[in-house]
Regions:
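NAD(P)-binding Rossmann-fold cofactor-contacting core
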Residues: 1-10
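Charged, low-complexity, helix-prone segments enriched in Lys/Glu/Asp/Gln
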Residues: 9-10, 19, 71
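Generic structural signal for hydrophobic
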Residues: 10-11, 53
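Glycine-rich, highly charged phosphate/nucleotide-binding loops
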Residues: 14-30
Length: 194
């Protein structure tokens, strides 16, 4: 996809050069000219940009990596095959009712990089889909919850193991095992619990 007007405006504000998708077969030339590649959520694992980045030794980042780089306010995360949006909404509502100013972000209507623009927010409740987790350099949120696991999104991930590995990344950046919220009744989630 070509960047829209909003993406172009963001790029100008951040001093980022946007580059259009190259002709098929020329990904290596393009990726070899950049320091980092930032992937939009949902780009399939089979996309040629990943092979080109590996070959060139170029880091592949997710929009959450940029948000973490630019903002250090607390982030709470929820992942799972089902129920993410409901739990994110409930957690955000509970935090708001306790006096915190939070923004639901991530796989919601608001990307985390947009949510961090709000200077009034105390924290962010991130709906962490496998699309966001799978290509993040290092996902960081605490606490982080994994609700459940079932086969899904095999049109985006290389296989079921890649989908599972993406979900498990929700706990990579927690400070302590006590920051992991795990549904131990789900055998896949339990197998990854810290």
């Amino acid at each position: 996809d070509a960047p829209g007007d909003e993406a172009r405006a963001w790029a100008v504000r951040l001093g980022v050069e946007l580059v259009e998708a190259p002709r098929p077969g020329s990904w290596a030339d393009l990726v070899g000219q950049v320091d980092e590649v930032v992937i939009a959520p949902g780009v399939p694992d089979r996309h040629p940009v990943f092979a080109a980045a590996r070959t060139a030794g170029v880091a592949v980042l997710d929009e959450s990596d940029l948000a973490f780089r630019w903002d250090d306010r607390p982030r709470y995360a929820v992942t799972g095959t089902n129920g993410k949006t409901t739990v994110v909404t409930l957690v955000a509502d509970m935090l708001e009712r306790s006096g915190r100013r939070v923004i639901p972000a991530g796989n919601t209507d608001t990307p985390l990089v947009a949510a961090i623009e709000d200077p009034e927010a105390d924290a962010f409740v991130v709906e962490a889909s496998s699309f966001r987790l799978g290509h993040a350099e290092r996902f960081r949120a605490a606490p982080a919850a994994w609700l459940n696991f079932a086969p899904d999104h095999l049109d985006v991930h290389a296989d079921l193991a890649a989908y599972e590995a993406a979900k498990a990344r929700v706990w990579e950046g927690i400070g302590s095992p006590a920051d992991a919220v795990a549904n131990l009744a789900d055998p896949v989630v339990a197998a990854h619990a810290p």
